[in-house]
Curated annotation (Swiss-Prot):
Organism placement in taxonomy: Bacteria, Bacillati, Cyanobacteriota, Cyanophyceae, Gomontiellales
Protein known as: Photosystem I reaction center subunit XI
Transmembrane segments: 53-73, 84-104, 125-145
Similarity comment text for this entry: Belongs to the PsaL family.
Chief location of this protein within or outside the cell: membrane
Length: 159
């Protein structure tokens, strides 16, 4: 008869209960590993500036929406502009925090296998994040401002 412990779905990672990681059908699946491996934080072959640019574009794009719909100017005609200004202010704060982290963490110049683990690499990542996030915020603002045109294109009004 099969041992009931062999049929558990949640078990210690690699059979070692002291690693502090639970192996579940979700966290250990090939789909999850592939998905996480393709995120810009873990993708191989990206330079720090491109990694920061891609992460920044995503963050800048999704930061505008909450400010437009939930911010103090949500019921006014300038809600989109208020969302853009607030989003860029938050991007500036995040960029300052990333820069401060890099200054504190990478004081010694040591050769690292990952270029992101050096002061120069982290500085490039921070610059890429700022440019990407600002660009993403402006793209979101433009789409919100021209929503009628974009909606017309998507519904086939302009053929």
């Amino acid at each position: 008869m099969a041992d009931a412990r062999d049929m558990e779905l949640i078990k210690p990672y690699n059979g070692d209960p002291f690693t502090g990681h639970l192996s579940t059908p979700i966290s250990d699946s090939d789909f999850t590993r592939t998905f996480i491996g393709n995120l810009p934080a873990y993708r191989k072959g990206l330079s720090p500036i491109l990694r920061g640019l891609e992460i920044g574009m995503a963050h800048g794009y999704f930061l505008i929406g909450p400010w437009v719909k939930l911010g103090p100017l949500r019921d006014s005609d300038v809600a989109n502009l208020g969302g853009l200004i607030s989003g860029i202010a938050l991007i500036l704060i995040a960029t300052a925090c990333l820069a401060a982290y890099g200054i504190v963490s990478f004081q010694k110049e040591e050769a690292a296998a990952n270029p992101l683990n050096t002061a120069e690499g982290w500085s490039q990542f921070t610059a890429g994040f700022f440019v990407g996030a600002t660009g993403g915020a402006f793209v979101a603002f433009t789409l919100l401002e021209k929503f009628d045109v974009v909606d017309g294109i998507m519904t086939g009004l302009f053929n």
